[in-house]
Amino acid sequence: MAKDYLFEIGTEEIPAHVVPRSVKQLADRTRKFLKENGLKFKDIKTFSTPRRLTILVEDLAEKQDDIDEVKKGPAKKITQDADGNWTKAAQGFARGQGMTTDDIYFEELKGTEYAYVHVQKEGKKASDILLGMSDIIKAMTFPTKMRWDSNDFEFVRPIHWLVSLFGSDVIPVKILDITAGRKTQGHRFLGDSVVLANADDYEDALKDQYVIANAEERKDMIVNQMNELVKKNHWQIKPDRDLLEEVTYLVEYPTVFAGSFDEKYLNIPDEVLITSMKDNQRYFEVYDENGKLINHFIAVRNGNKDYLDNIISGNEKVLVARLDDAQFFYDEDRKYPLSHFVDRLKNVSFHDKIGSMAEKIQRVRMIGDYLAKRWDLPENVVTDFDRASELYKFDLVTQMVGEFAELQGVMGMHYARLAGEDEEVSVAIKEHYMPATAEGPLPETTVGSLLSVADKIDTIITFFGAGMIPTSSNDPYALRRYAYGIVRILLNEKWSLPFNEVLPEIINMLGGVTPAKLPKGDSEQEIADFIRDRVKQYLQKNKFKYDIVDAVLASSQQDPSQILAAANVLQLHHDDEEFKPVVESLTRINNILKKAKFNGKVDVDESLFVDNSETELYARVQNLQNIESLADLYQGFVHLQPVIDQYFEANMIMDKDENVKNNRLAQLYAVSELADRLGDLSKLVIK
């Protein structure tokens, strides 16, 4: 007969972000433990709060299945020597089945005698196996661990109680001096301890003691109560899954309430108010029906509605203290012109191995001007970029950003607007940090995109130059994210940038104006390859077929926009009827060139043509040389494919005449160079 098994670890408050992954780990480890021990079960449910990690194993078998089976071993000639003594092979076979050599017997199978044993074993009781749950606790891992008392044992937080019930029976799992029983604890302030008669009583018994053990139920309670408040007051709130998740794991019994603050604080930029409420206090900001931020907030307490007025008043006082600070910083910062802050950047270090923030600004402007010229950007964009690049780091030395570091860029935008800067300049100051995460929003303005790319290129170049290069396991300065951001912006703006050409030019340009150590030689290509690797990340993220990704990245192409264009062409035509013969023809050419070890240093000489097919191929290839679009180039290959086949039919490539042979190889090399713009087509999986 199967019964439910309850296992609860009661602790001091666990950080909210650690709770969900910890209870999942407990469930995963338990699932593996039960399967390894041959205990059947239906499923594992999880319960979790800041003070408990709990699993409920549904329909757990009371014992392992009994074993009654015949095990086949090695051949008889291997199990006994000439004198009939048991060999080590026989002893090992018997021992592996929990038997002795006395239990071995022989039977013939297809003309050969083999050793057998008849294994009969009664399954172990679940109650005995479950004592091993203590090993699961000891094996659990966490971002940080704590010790308590004088023990060496570590856990995410000190353990205060354990519950271990198999149906109605206690399984006395033990950790340190704590032995599991049937007593659990209710809410720290509102509930009492409760003795569980049966594992199935857990959820309802805790509800009576003001603990909602089911995290999804707590989340639903929070959402429903918030919706009631919003509807009642004609407000709006913006969904914030991360904050909702956090408050769900901060409380055991949620009660939602609304508070307010003086309207005078609404003169502060919205982002400051939201940061003060959300990041510092875990409040949800509130908007009116028109989507405008208003002087109210919604919060969640860990308790019931008793004394709620006192709770609201206390939360309002804490928030007002923070808003007073924010108002002071805002007023103080606005007393000075932007030039005051820009001048102070001379004394702000970008990195002690690289130089000051002012020096970085100088480099970024040069990089941006170089890129703008390369991309032939409009004069007004260049003018706005130059001004934005002069200002874009000034808010780092403002008091507001000193208090709210996460608002760098945002406050720069607001202060620039207040100072009368052009909107494009102001917005670019904010956008240069974008994308802030790998898949975060990209800059929406051209100036912002240019500034972001220039800033990130400078960061990568100077960090590589200083020897601070990411390893496979360590990237403390987020250089991979910066490189991926560069790739995403370039592709979004459709800007061409072959890094193997551009980086040496940028580094050479910066060499005479910056004291920062810059990369040289192989390091330049190392940076180009580093950024190019992020193109692979982009292609994989956007669901390109793995063989297409391998093919386009195996080409000599260094321009992300061209690599993406090649991937799009190959993905688009991958299933076309003519795709296979085109790829096979081009791959055949590459194979011939590799086998001949041809280096391509011979020009095609038309006077050496023997057959009309050579003239035809030469003319067609000449026409393809001028095609810029990879989509058009592919179509050119479609039409070229029968010409290539005819060329092979009519000509012996490895002709006895050395000049003719090299001339034909040179023709094939010209085709191969064009095909390389699409990638190494031999890596494509063609069916």
From Swiss-Prot:
Reaction equation(s) it catalyzes: tRNA(Gly) + glycine + ATP = glycyl-tRNA(Gly) + AMP + diphosphate
Cellular location(s): Cytoplasm
Enzyme Commission no: 6.1.1.14
Molecular function GO labels: arginine-tRNA ligase activity; ATP binding; glycine-tRNA ligase activity
Top-rank EC class of the record's enzyme: ligase
GO CC entries: cytosol
GO biological process, one term: arginyl-tRNA aminoacylation
SUPFAM superfamilies in the cross-refs: HD-domain/PDEase-like
Keyword terms: Aminoacyl-tRNA synthetase, ATP-binding, Cytoplasm, Ligase, Nucleotide-binding, Protein biosynthesis
Similarity comment: Belongs to the class-II aminoacyl-tRNA synthetase family.
UniProt-listed HAMAP family: Gly_tRNA_synth_beta
UniProt subunit comment: Tetramer of two alpha and two beta subunits.
Name used for this protein in its record: Glycine--tRNA ligase beta subunit
